[in-house]
């Protein structure tokens, strides 16, 4: 027993299974016609996302129809009060041992910080690395302070595990700790004070789930979650860099990029570039990671000449540079042997768990318009006019554009324009800036209409009601137009992603954690990089068609200053095919990413592969198993690309998730990609829908800011095409296809904008 006088803190050991059941489900296989009843008395028919099963289990869930007529699965119902089994400790933990581990971890971390200060290496202004880092975190934006406690905890966890000689598997199940109040404030995400009846979402996403212990779920600053346990090589934070079969180093991410992803022009037969661009815009609404920094300075992992990596004491503990072969077909021309790569910032754990690293998401996990409005009060306020509920904008040519940035740090020095929005990546590429401009205009259009309908509403009411409507518009388009286009209508129905138009629902579950998966952020939702074209074909109505290489419009949205460019570019995005999703990626991304006026840039494919290893995502085969597919045991099973894979991977079990997912043949029901990515993406957005109390269709039993039946019927009329037509500078004479993501064709002909009627805002009169 501990002496009664020892009051520093109390350590309560509770070994828990690796993932809470609200976070994990397993893949299922479905027959085409689900039955309406479950045969077992211990099962009930629920939506798939509501069913809790073990992540490592190979379970086949029987399909059925829910009481609402939706496709569900027969799921075992746990008996009330039944507790999950807890494994006993194979050792006894003394307070002294734990204190020693904390002390040793603190000493190691302190030495690391002192070493960093002594060997401080920062990026040089204008270098490719600086531009690449702007891709992850442009300076000067209120993203929230990085928490050094999260990194110290990694060294504490390693010290603790080493002292107990724990295996890697045991380290993934490190105990939860109940600490004294002072340590809890230091190591845990703070609880939020919530009003369960608040009509509007919080800007930072907190209190969506008003249960005190869950009030941070999905909020900005909450970590990414996982479908499967991480593959950290030390069970704590060491990235996945060795073969799980041979133990030898995995091939360089750049070598894999060169071998597997050439630049081949294969245009998609159905979808246009607007699908690609809307996907990136929406991804910024629910994912925002940033690399580790030294205070406000960037971390450099390569030497000044990029001829090699920094070594020994000169290397930051978060460095993970990408090696470049001396025989590289492109970088060898410039003597480049090292691409800078810094690991992602970590978050504190909401449960004070002393365990493996969890990556930080700086924006809300919800689809809530945070890319338009921001994820914190300071940023949101800076974007408002505080008059009539409108957002700030600029009119340099008489046409409404985003407000200009206060500094040019996030753009090329020679850019004539640099904008700001709710997300600081707004200037990454001009087509992304176009999407931000569209939804800025939509906000101000709706706010102006509401002000005319409800003259008694003040600025705050107009702003919040408009934000609520625009968030609903984004959800409606995302779930009913975008997701069916990428995962297929069958998969969208299977996971309950499609909405019942004009009807209130009550699907919210406080037990579904609305958190973005590492697997989505680090791999699956990066599928769109394969669909990027190397150039925009901009069809101007009043001048000659223009072919613009994408590297000319990275961090340079100046073309928006041209009169009528906004309208012309939207027409062009709807008309130009996206690239086919396959084993090809444009050199604009794999050689010239953010090159500026340099002859070379970085390689996004390499960054994606390295990011997956930083996240410690498990190999592709593990996710095939999770999705109900057979593991691939030979490279021949990958098809024609198998020989190229075999040239850079030792074993099929080594193939990275992003690589394998891109190469998987599309499903038969119209998805862009194969079953693995389709399952991950569908599972993800089912969680974000059914775990969102404020989802736009949820009625008064669930959502204190619910829409009336009349308002939902108007929202059901909204389409991306109608939003585009409502916000053009010259809608007369402009035609758009009703399905804005599909190329114009005889089955999807362009129709005059006057026929694309959206919602009638008079449904909001007096409400």
From Swiss-Prot:
Species this chain originates from: Anopheles gambiae (African malaria mosquito)
- Give the matching CDD domains: peroxinectin_like (cd09823)
Active-site residues, Swiss-Prot/TrEMBL = 284
**Catalytic reaction annotation:** 2 a phenolic donor + H2O2 = 2 a phenolic radical donor + 2 H2O
Gene Ontology cellular-component annotations: extracellular region
Q: Which residues form the propeptide?
A: 28-187
Site for Transition state stabilizer, residues: 425
Residues annotated as binding heme b are 529
Glycan attachment residues as annotated in the record: 165, 237, 457, 658, 764
List the EC numbers from the record. Answer: 1.11.1.7
Q: What is this protein called?
A: Chorion peroxidase
Query: Which family is it part of?
Result: Belongs to the peroxidase family. XPO subfamily.
Signal peptide span = 1-27
């Amino acid at each position: 027993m501990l002496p009664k006088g020892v009051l520093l803190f109390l350590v309560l050991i509770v070994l828990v299974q690796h993932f809470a059941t609200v976070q994990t489900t397993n893949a299922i296989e479905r027959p085409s016609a689900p039955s309406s009843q479950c045969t077992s008395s211990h099962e009930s028919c629920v939506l798939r996302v509501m069913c809790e099963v073990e992540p490592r289990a190979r379970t086949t869930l029987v399909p059925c129809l829910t009481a609402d007529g939706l496709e569900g699965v027969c799921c075992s119902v746990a008996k009330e009060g039944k507790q999950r089994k807890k494994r006993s400790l194979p050792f006894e933990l003394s307070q002294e041992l734990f204190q020693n581990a904390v002390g040793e971890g603190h000493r190691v971390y302190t030495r690391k910080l002192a070493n960093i200060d002594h060997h401080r290496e920062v990026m040089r202004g204008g270098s490719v690395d600086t531009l690449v880092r702007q891709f992850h975190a442009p300076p000067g934006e209120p993203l929230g302070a990085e928490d050094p406690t999260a990194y110290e905890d990694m060294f504490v966890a390693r010290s603790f595990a080493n002292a107990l000689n724990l295996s890697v598997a045991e380290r993934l199940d490190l105990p939860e700790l109940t600490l004294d109040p002072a340590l809890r404030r230091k190591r845990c995400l703070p609880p939020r004070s919530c009003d369960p009846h608040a009509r509007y979402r919080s800007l930072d996403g907190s209190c969506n789930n008003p249960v005190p212990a869950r009030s941070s779920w999905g909020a900005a600053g909450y970590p990414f979650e996982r479908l499967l346990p991480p593959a950290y090589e030390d069970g704590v934070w060491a990235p996945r860099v060795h073969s799980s079969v041979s133990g030898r180093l995995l091939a360089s991410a750049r070598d894999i990029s060169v071998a597997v992803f050439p630049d081949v022009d294969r245009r998609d037969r159905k979808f246009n570039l607007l699908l690609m661009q809307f996907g990136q815009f929406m991804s910024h609404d629910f994912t925002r990671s940033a690399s580790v920094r030294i205070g406000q300075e960037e971390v450099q992992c390569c030497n000044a000449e990029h001829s090699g990596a920094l070594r020994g004491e000169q290397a930051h503990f978060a460095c993970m540079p990408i090696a470049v072969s001396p025989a590289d077909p492109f970088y060898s021309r410039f003597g480049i042997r090292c691409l800078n790569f810094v690991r992602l910032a970590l978050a504190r754990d909401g449960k004070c768990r002393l365990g493996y690293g969890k990556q930080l998401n700086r924006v809300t996990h919800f689809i809530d318009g945070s890319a338009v409005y921001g994820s914190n009060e300071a940023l949101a306020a800076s974007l408002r006019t505080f008059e009539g509920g409108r957002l700030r904008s600029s009119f340099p040519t008489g046409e409404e554009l985003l407000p200009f940035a206060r500094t040019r740090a996030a753009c090329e020095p020679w850019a004539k324009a640099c904008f700001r929005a709710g997300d600081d990546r707004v200037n990454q590429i001009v087509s992304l800036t176009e999407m931000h401009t569209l939804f800025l205009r939509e906000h101000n259009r709706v706010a102006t209409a509401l002000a005319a309908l409800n003259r008694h509403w003040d600025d705050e009411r107009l702003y919040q009601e408009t934000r609520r409507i625009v968030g609903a518009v984004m959800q409606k388009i995302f779930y009913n137009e975008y997701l069916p286009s990428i995962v297929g209508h069958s998969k969208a129905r299977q996971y309950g992603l499609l909405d019942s138009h004009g009807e209130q629902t009550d699907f919210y579950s406080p037990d579904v954690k609305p958190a973005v998966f590492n697997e989505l952020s680090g791999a699956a939702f990066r599928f769109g990089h394969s669909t990027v074209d190397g150039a925009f074909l901009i069809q101007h109505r009043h001048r000659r068609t223009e072919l613009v290489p994408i590297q000319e419009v990275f961090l340079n949205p100046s073309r928006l200053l041209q009169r009528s460019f906004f309208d012309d570019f939207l027409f062009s995005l709807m008309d130009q095919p996206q690239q086919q999703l396959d084993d090809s990626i444009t050199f604009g991304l794999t050689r010239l990413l953010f090159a500026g006026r340099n002859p070379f840039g970085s390689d996004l494919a390499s960054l994606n592969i390295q990011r997956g290893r930083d996240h410690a995502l498990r190999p592709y085969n593990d996710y095939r198993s999770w999705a109900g597919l057979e593991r691939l045991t030979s490279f021949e099973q990958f098809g024609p690309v198998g020989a190229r894979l075999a040239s850079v991977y030792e074993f099929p079990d080594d193939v990275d998730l992003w690589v394998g997912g891109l190469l998987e043949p599309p499903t038969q029901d119209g998805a862009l990609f194969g079953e693995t990515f389709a399952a991950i993406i569908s599972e993800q957005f089912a969680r974000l829908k059914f775990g969102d109390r404020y989802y736009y269709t949820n009625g008064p039993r669930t959502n204190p800011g619910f829409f009336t039946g009349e308002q939902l019927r108007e929202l059901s009329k909204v389409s991306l095409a109608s939003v585009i037509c409502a916000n053009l500078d010259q809608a007369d004479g402009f035609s758009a296809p009703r399905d804005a993501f599909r190329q114009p064709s005889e089955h999807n002909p362009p129709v005059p904008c006057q026929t694309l009627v959206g919602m009638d805002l008079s449904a909001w009169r007096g409400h």
